[in-house]
């Protein structure tokens, strides 16, 4: 018995010695860790201050022990999360050992105050747990919900498009709590009513799946049998924007994808709405129809409003600070803009782009293309910016096919130069023919109060003052974007009536 105990003790000591030698750990750079999840989500929506704990496992799939040189939270001491790695609490850990084909637990805890300002407790609280092993850096994402909100369609929808259907009835988003769109929301066989004062925040980011590949995860998409009706008021507008409200992100473009009015969707309307901080504002696809009234579209990393072979009516709308065309019309369709201000400063893209075709292959060759007649009417509107030409036209027939490119500007302020001479002088008589009566303004003309700071109200000496024509048909438009009564005889051009 004594011999057995001595042998057992000796074997145990030998094992300890072997297992604790540094050379026992693999240093192969191809030896990586595995994790039981790539994203750890905390599913609790707090109504008061509270904490939640979730866990995942770090797996060593290798046939030799491995040493994780560093485990830490990316935000460091500022992180809202705390960790417990293999029984040890903290925010940073060094030289964590995992035996061959073994695993250890990582517990993550978060404390949320849903009543804190959004700048402190955003809708989606995100963090990364970083792992450094043999020169490799790996990560596990942590996500928690920082506000008492309606997370829609689901708090687990990142990278997973979901269809909202109400069997051809309607849904009212009238909860006083904000709505957070997390993922891609398809609206089908349903009318979604969005009443005055509703706040909608869209959580964007890069996502990837087999159906769409890599794309921006954060979109509202209205399918053919779906409709969206936004019913804001001057006092209580509906605001649709990204969910990052920290100071550095408050006016940052490209945070989420945008709103798509899909092919053949009818009866969509936005009244007193603001759509901002997206890749594009609103995209109306083939044969869709859309009405915009008293709506602002701005801070986009491409175009503010896109119409492709669609029907759009816009009254008293302000579209600005867009990296692409502020308004981009392609492949024809029917468009009417009344009392709109379309402004483009600091970018090479024109404020307005109009064409009656669409290329389905390389834009330079455009061998495969769709052609459809364009009817576009602009009345009492400003199309202006910092470039020489803020209007860009594309008539696939070069003016040879009557009725294919029908454009008309009445009582408008525009800015054109090269447009009047290019395309074999096709538009040399644009001012006076298609644009009549019009003012072709220059940068020397007084127009806005302060375009450099996105104040598009009219200057006291603005050339737009009193130059519009009252619009009585097909509907009376007698107030401006801010609810100011327009002059009954000589209203001002653009979305703002100057207030004396």
Where in the sequence are the language-model features?
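Short acidic/proline- and small/hydrophobic-mixed sequence motifs that coincide with surface turns
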Residues: 51-52, 63-68
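Sec-dependent N-terminal signal peptides
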Residues: 4-13
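Short, solvent-exposed loop/linker segments at beta-strand-coil boundaries, enriched for Pro/Gly
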Residues: 74-92
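Asparagine-centered strand-capping/turn motif at beta-strand->loop junctions
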Residues: 58-62
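Beta-strand/loop edge motif enriched in small/polar residues
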Residues: 22-24, 33-44, 49-50, 93-103, ...
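C-terminal motif of bacterial Sec signal peptides marking the signal peptidase cleavage site
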Residues: 15-18
